[in-house]
């Protein structure tokens, strides 16, 4: 099986990326989804609050997903559901995906470009090292959400929730609405990990207490959870003796973090961020692996699905551009016109259009010819092999780009490019996405998304170019649970021809 663009994941990121790629001109797209239906995690998120940025109206999770699913179906984009991707490989510039499903067994899919949109998973109890037995009644918040919203089953009636991530906060409200008693939400950090609006709507409105700097130190019960012991923690996250509190319950829900599903990415050797546990990407969402893009929660955990869709659309469009640059679904005339768009003078534009017209006529003539010339095929094959050899030799890494000029007898031309600019996190910033910006590839503006490391009030969001402060914007409050963003405008980058480093940092008043 072959495809120009393979998208791994049929959730909100994968669907948005597929639509963006199709709109950008990619006809050959294949979406691979391990679940039996498209939509990803949105199918179990029956609460509202989705779509305010994308559709300018408030939707539930399934409604938001259905709008994208319908567009994908109308666009005729093929999707393989109930299909698990188990391996990614690359040989001689070709990417190979190994997947399996019940109908076809083992599948090998050759793709020219890949978009990773596998989402994330919840951190399990085993990662917490909580003392006690392993009784029934301990669930991740996402599992409990699926049981209640999809399968119609109640995990328990007396509930304690550990962790104040958005899923945990939403499940506190959901369990209460279903008749359960939620005793408390305990959070080991001195601040909540979820959105402020979820704290208000899911806890405050229902009288559910939030205990900060508190964790579960013991789970009681052998066959079924009978209760938990909570304790305060110090600044090193160690339980403080004498602060223990026993709460009887039959269910413990864990909302203690999300981990991007990046086993495939790591096995392929992509450069990874130790903070987000996702791949490092440039302004086009391209990883360190050429032609492999990433978006959504597989890249870094988002709090709003609208931002996932925006990021995925960027990845889809960038993948389409990458395919065009690498000779897929693009004619010789298109290449000449594309080069003309980069020329500044009107004379250059007119000459290129004339050349493009000639190239288009020649292509039409060649298509009507019954027989092809073997020597021309050999010439194109050797040229492609030489281009691939140049790519492997690291030519593109040192800032040079190959272009073909059919009007000049297909002479080799080299266009100098500026070196990629490193984007780094400064004071109180945990990470930045993207981590590189290529000025020649950046659009009118590039969004840098990041999270802070603590709750900060009346601070300034600052952006510096090689240590020089460029912008300083006051923020009334910054919190780790809410993603922030800074805008880098291309017009500003043009003023700094030798720029090597952009730093995003937070300053006090």
Task: Describe the residue ranges of each PLM region.
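FAD-site-proximal beta/loop scaffold in flavoenzymes
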Residues: 116, 138-148, 251-302, 385-386
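FAD-binding core/adjacent interface of flavoenzyme oxidoreductases
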Residues: 1-8, 66-158, 234-242, 253, ...
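Predominantly flavin-linked oxidoreductase catalytic cores and closely associated redox partners
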Residues: 106-107, 116-209, 218-220, 298-301
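Beta1-alpha1 glycine-rich phosphate/pyrophosphate-binding loop at the start
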Residues: 5-67, 71, 146, 155-199, ...
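Surface beta-strand/loop "capping" patches
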Residues: 328-348, 366, 397-455
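Short, aromatic- and glycine-rich surface loops/edge beta-strands on solvent-exposed regions
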Residues: 461, 491-509
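A conserved FAD-binding loop/helix module that cradles the flavin
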Residues: 295-329, 393, 407-408
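A Rossmann-like FAD-binding core segment of flavoenzymes
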Residues: 67, 72-99, 176-263, 343-361, ...
């Amino acid at each position: 099986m072959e495809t120009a663009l393979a998208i791994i994941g049929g959730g909100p990121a994968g669907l948005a990326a597929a639509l963006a790629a199709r709109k950008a001109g990619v006809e050959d797209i294949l979406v691979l989804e391990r679940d039996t239906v498209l939509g990803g995690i949105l199918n179990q998120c029956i609460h509202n609050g989705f779509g305010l940025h994308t559709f300018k109206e408030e939707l539930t999770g399934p409604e938001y997903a259905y709008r994208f699913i319908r567009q994908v179906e109308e666009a005729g984009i093929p999707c393989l559901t109930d299909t698990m991707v188990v391996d990614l490989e690359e040989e001689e510039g070709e990417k190979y995906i190994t997947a399996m499903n019940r109908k076809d067994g083992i599948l090998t899919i050759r793709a020219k470009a890949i978009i990773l949109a596998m989402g994330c998973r919840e951190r399990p109890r085993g990662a917490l090292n909580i003392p006690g037995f392993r009784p029934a009644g301990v669930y991740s918040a996402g599992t409990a959400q699926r049981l209640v919203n999809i399968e119609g089953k109640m995990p328990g009636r007396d509930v304690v929730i550990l962790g104040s991530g958005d899923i945990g906060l939403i499940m506190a409200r959901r369990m209460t609405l279903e008749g359960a008693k939620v005793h408390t939400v305990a959070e080991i950090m001195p601040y909540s990990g979820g959105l402020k609006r979820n704290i208000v709507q899911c806890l405050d409105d229902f009288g559910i207490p939030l205990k900060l700097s508190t964790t579960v130190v013991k789970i009681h019960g052998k066959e079924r959870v009978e209760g938990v012991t909570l304790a305060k923690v110090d600044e090193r996250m160690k339980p403080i003796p004498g602060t223990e509190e026993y709460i009887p319950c039959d269910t413990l829900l864990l909302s203690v973090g999300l981990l991007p599903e990046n086993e495939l990415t790591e096995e392929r050797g992509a450069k990874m961020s130790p903070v987000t546990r996702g791949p490092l990407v440039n302004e086009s969402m391209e990883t360190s692996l050429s032609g492999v893009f990433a978006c959504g929660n597989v890249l870094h955990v988002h709090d709003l699905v609208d931002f996932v869709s925006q990021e995925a659309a960027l990845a889809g469009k960038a993948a389409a551009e990458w395919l065009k640059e690498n000779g897929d679904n693009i004619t010789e005339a298109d290449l000449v016109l594309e080069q003309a768009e980069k020329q500044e003078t009107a004379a250059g534009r007119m000459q290129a259009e004339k050349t493009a017209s000639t190239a288009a006529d020649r292509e039409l003539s060649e298509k009507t010819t019954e027989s092809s010339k073997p020597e021309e095929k050999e010439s194109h094959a050797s040229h492609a092999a030489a281009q691939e050899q140049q790519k492997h030799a690291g030519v593109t890494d040192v800032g040079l780009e190959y272009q073909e000029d059919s009007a000049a007898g297909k002479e080799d031309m080299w266009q100098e490019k500026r070196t990629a600019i490193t984007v780094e996190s400064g004071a109180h910033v945990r990470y930045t996405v993207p981590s590189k910006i290529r000025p020649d590839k950046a659009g009118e503006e590039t969004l840098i998304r990041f999270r802070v490391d603590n709750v900060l009030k009346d601070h300034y969001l600052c952006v510096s170019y090689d240590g020089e402060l460029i912008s300083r914007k006051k923020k009334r409050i910054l919190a780790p649970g809410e993603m922030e963003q800074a805008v880098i405008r291309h017009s500003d980058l043009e003023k700094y021809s030798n720029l090597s480093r952009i730093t995003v940092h937070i300053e006090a008043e």
